[in-house]
Amino acid sequence: MSINLQNVSYTYQAGTPFEGRALFNINLDILDGSYTAFIGHTGSGKSTIMQLLNGLHVPTTGIVSVDKQDITNHSKNKEIKSIRKHVGLVFQFPESQLFEETVLKDVAFGPQNFGVSPEEAEALAREKLALVGISENLFEKNPFELSGGQMRRVAIAGILAMQPKVLVLDEPTAGLDPKGRKELMTIFKKLHQSGMTIVLVTHLMDDVANYADFVYVLDKGKIILSGKPKTIFQQVSLLEKKQLGVPKVTKLAQRLVDRGIPISSLPITLEELKEVLKHG
């Protein structure tokens, strides 16, 4: 499922004394089966774009096209509902949205809300809970009895149970320790390898380098760079000027260059750095 934004602008609280422009004439494509990352400083417009992709916001001007279905300023909620089924949105700290009395019921709620039978919804819930690493002995537990990391996995399973074709992740590993973050990113990697389109908002440049295949860089509501991670992270000075930084190995390689060691193309992953050091 591909997504396209054409001349999209968005204004919060339009027509009030508090109105503020969040996006300016955004044009972008998210290709079917891609792993696209959005990076930018706080207030750059990343989260607004995520909510446009899912239909939580409609554009003030322009068109958001999801699998050739257009969302405009005049779109009605019933027209957008099918898009929300196909584009799953995982907010920061999604565990805050858990509410059912058991883990299984919570994950099954979403598909039932879209008209799936209780039996099929339970089967989907069991499948997706297993996918995110929640063992069956936890299915009848109250979600709030679980650890923070487990609660987050349950919340993500609830999104996956609705069988989206696109998974939009807004800082999905926020607050997790390195082990928990790596485990969660590995789950998303496997989903991508299975054919799901992944959209990631993150401030962790190492995750962008290791997982994404395309990157958009936002600043003050505008796209200032776009391209493959390898290309984007060559722009060290610009990214640092925008307070974004680069992957750790890229920063190390740049220091070597600054000391006179020739490196034709800065590495962005540990594997690339090893190759650079090996071949000189």
Swiss-Prot record:
SMART domains: AAA (SM00382). ATP binds at G40, H41, T42, G43, S44, G45, K46, S47. It comes from the Bacteria. This is Energy-coupling factor transporter ATP-binding protein EcfA2. CDD domains: ABC_cobalt_CbiO_domain1. It is an enzyme of class 7 (translocase). InterPro entries: AAA+_ATPase (IPR003593), ABC_transporter-like_ATP-bd (IPR003439), ABC_transporter-like_CS (IPR017871), ABC_transpr_CbiO/EcfA_su (IPR015856), ECF_ABC_transporter_ATP-bd (IPR050095), EcfA2 (IPR030946), P-loop_NTPase (IPR027417). It holds the Pfam family ABC_tran. The keyword ATP-binding applies. Belongs to the ABC transporter superfamily. Energy-coupling factor EcfA family. The lineage of its organism: Bacteria, Bacillati, Bacillota, Bacilli, Lactobacillales. Forms a stable energy-coupling factor (ECF) transporter complex composed of 2 membrane-embedded substrate-binding proteins (S component), 2 ATP-binding proteins (A component) and 2 transmembrane proteins (T component). One of its GO terms (molecular function) is ATP hydrolysis activity. Its EC number is 7.-.-.-. ATP-binding (A) component of a common energy-coupling factor (ECF) ABC-transporter complex. Unlike classic ABC transporters this ECF transporter provides the energy necessary to transport a number of different substrates. NCBIfam families: ECF_ATPase_2. Keywords: ATP-binding, Cell membrane, Membrane, Nucleotide-binding, Translocase, Transport. It is found in: Cell membrane. It is a peripheral membrane protein. PROSITE patterns: ABC_TRANSPORTER_1, ABC_TRANSPORTER_2, CBIO. One of its GO terms (cellular component) is ATP-binding cassette (ABC) transporter complex. Its main location: membrane. Gene3D superfamilies: P-loop containing nucleotide triphosphate hydrolases.
